[in-house]
Curated annotation (Swiss-Prot):
Name recorded for this polypeptide: Exopolyphosphatase
Function summary: Degradation of inorganic polyphosphates (polyP). Releases orthophosphate processively from the ends of the polyP chain. Has a strong preference for long-chain polyphosphates and has only weak affinity for smaller size polyP of about 15 residues.
Organism of this sequence: Escherichia coli (strain K12)
Membrane topology, from the record: Peripheral membrane protein
Description of activity control: Activity is redox-regulated. Highly sensitive to inactivation by oxidation. Strongly stimulated by potassium salts.
Gene transcribed to yield this protein: ppx
Activity profile over pH: Optimum pH is 8.
Family stated for the protein in its record: Belongs to the GppA/Ppx family.
Length: 513
């Protein structure tokens, strides 16, 4: 048997989930096409405890989070940025000063943090369960986190219903169990509040139905483990077993005195509010039994990353679906895309340090989807399109990616005010401003909506934000309208500090070789 194995080292991935209660990291490698978990790390951070009534994250909570990220960074040494995905969930969605935390995190861990929407979180949780559980058929997946609860019905890796509600074991502890006091009234109020938050989706979920219900969170895992210790060896959660558990919990007066078999010390402060939410979910959806799933958000993120390496990007499906939904003129979208990317490739050659693969992909989708707002009105098209892109549920896109796509589309025509641009943490201005310029030119050069008016050759020369666009010899004699549009565009550029657009024609016709 040879001592040295010459087979290539398996690709390793890391997914980090910045939850409201705990930060989790899971590391995996792909062996023969299968994902193999090789390490897990979890730190209780209590981020949501530091979120005040003004939705500002306290300095203490930020410090706890940054200390944990520093620990994770040690384990991630040597990982390429493409192999690490860090997602922020409910508390970072809510915190008005989340940007401050993200900027400080950049100095601690050299990987971008993506804040994802509640629905995107729910979709990824479902994918994590679907990839790791052997059960077939339609699944109901529930995840009760520190700040939000996600519910999904789906089948064969396709989510059908996706919902996220602002109720979690940390936020409910503060709202319904002040001082950690446990009594029947507090518990009932929390249980009713949870059921009430699901009122609007109850019938939708019941009508869809499911073959198996799966739970994927710390709360559900804790309930499962306590029930096992209480003699329910299969660990399945049923309404009857939940009532038995509630009865046991109500024997205690406060979180500090809570003593249940199988319940860890660190779980004490959030178990009771989490249990109340679980009871409310059971009540609202009439769940008969719930099984524990090993997979959750971070596993979903891992499989999503691995899929992108195999070019199975869910975002492409999302973009195609949106294009179909809004009846986009696919030929025009393709013309704009081709012209924009023709110029992008020239810009990238001249400015390689500013090129960003993720931004390139977002530019492509923005070019394809810049006319989604036509269904509302042609007047203000750029604003309507941006609104749709920013406010639609777009599976696969994190919040910043979605906002970036909306921003590119919002400024693809008319005047530009740089002061109105949103702030981004994942992308720098010098990286994305050229993409706005490229998309503007790509759209403008296809205003006639005919392939015949697109120049056969186009040369772009860039010097910072001073651009020269060179057209074939005598091309404008046949395309006077395009020249008028370009002259108007030059005026828009002059209104932006530092931007200049020069238009030229080749001095002599190109001679074919």
């Amino acid at each position: 048997m040879p001592i040295h194995d010459k087979s290539p080292r398996p690709q390793e991935f890391a997914a980090v989930d910045l939850g409201s209660n705990s930060f989790h990291m899971v590391i995996a490698r792909v062996v023969d096409g299968a994902m193999q978990i090789i390490g897990r790390l979890k730190q209780r951070v209590h981020l949501a405890d530091g979120l005040g009534p003004d939705n500002m994250l306290s300095e203490e909570a930020m410090t706890r989070g940054l200390n944990c990220l520093s620990l994770f960074a040690e384990r991630l040494q040597g990982f390429s940025p493409a192999s690490v995905c860090i997602v922020g969930t409910h508390t970072l969605r809510q915190a008005l000063n989340a940007t401050d935390f993200l900027k400080r995190a950049e100095k601690v861990i050299p990987y971008p943090i993506e804040i994802i929407s509640g629905n995107e979180e729910a979709r990824l949780i479902f994918m994590g369960v679907e990839h790791t559980q052997p059960e077939k058929g339609r699944k109901l997946v529930i995840d009760i986190g520190g700040g939000s609860t996600e519910l999904v019905i789906g089948e064969n890796f396709e989510p059908i219903l996706v919902e996220s509600r602002r109720m979690g074991c940390v936020s409910f502890a503060q709202l319904y169990f002040p001082g950690g006091v446990i009594n029947k009234e507090n518990f009932q109020r929390a249980r009713m509040a949870a059921a009430q938050k699901l009122e609007t989706l109850t019938w939708q979920f019941r009508i869809q139905g499911w073959n198996v219900a799966m739970g994927a969170s710390g709360t559900i895992k804790a309930a499962h483990e306590v029930l096992m210790e209480m003699g329910e060896k299969d660990g399945i959660i049923t309404p009857e077993r939940l009532e038995k558990l509630v009865k046991e919990v109500l024997r205690h007066r406060n979180f500090a005195s809570l003593s249940l078999p199988g319940l860890s010390e660190e779980r004490k402060t959030v178990f009771v509010p989490g249990l109340a939410i679980l009871c409310g979910v059971f009540d609202a959806l009439a769940i008969r039994e719930l099984r524990l799933s090993d997979g959750a958000l971070r596993e979903g993120v891992l499989y999503e990353m691995e899929g992108r390496f195999r070019h199975q990007d869910v975002r492409s499906r999302t973009a195609s679906s949106l294009a179909n939904q809004y009846h986009i003129d696919s030929e025009q979208a393709r013309r704009v895309l081709d012209t924009t990317m023709q110029m992008y490739e020239q810009w990238r050659e001249q400015q390689p340090k500013l090129a960003h693969p993720q931004l390139e992909a977002l530019l492509r989708w923005a070019a394809m989807l810049h006319e989604v707002g036509l269904n509302i009105n042609h007047s203000g098209l750029h604003r309507h399109s941006a609104y749709i892109l920013q406010n639609s549920d777009l599976p696969g896109f994190n919040q910043e990616q979605q906002l970036m796509m909306a921003t590119l589309v919002r400024y693809h025509r008319k005047a530009i005010k740089l002061d109105d641009l949103p702030r981004f943490t994942l992308f720098k201005k010098k990286q994305f401003l050229p993409l706005i310029q490229l998309l503007r030119l790509g759209v403008l050069l296809n205003n006639q909506r005919q392939a015949t008016t697109t120049p056969p050759t186009l040369t772009l020369i860039t010097d910072d934000s001073h651009w020269t666009l060179r057209f074939p010899h005598d091309w404008f004699s046949q395309n006077a309208l395009v020249l008028l549009d370009l002259e108007k565009e030059q005026e828009y550029w002059e209104g932006v500090a530092g931007w200049r657009l020069k238009i030229e024609e080749e001095s002599t016709p190109e001679i074919a070789a």
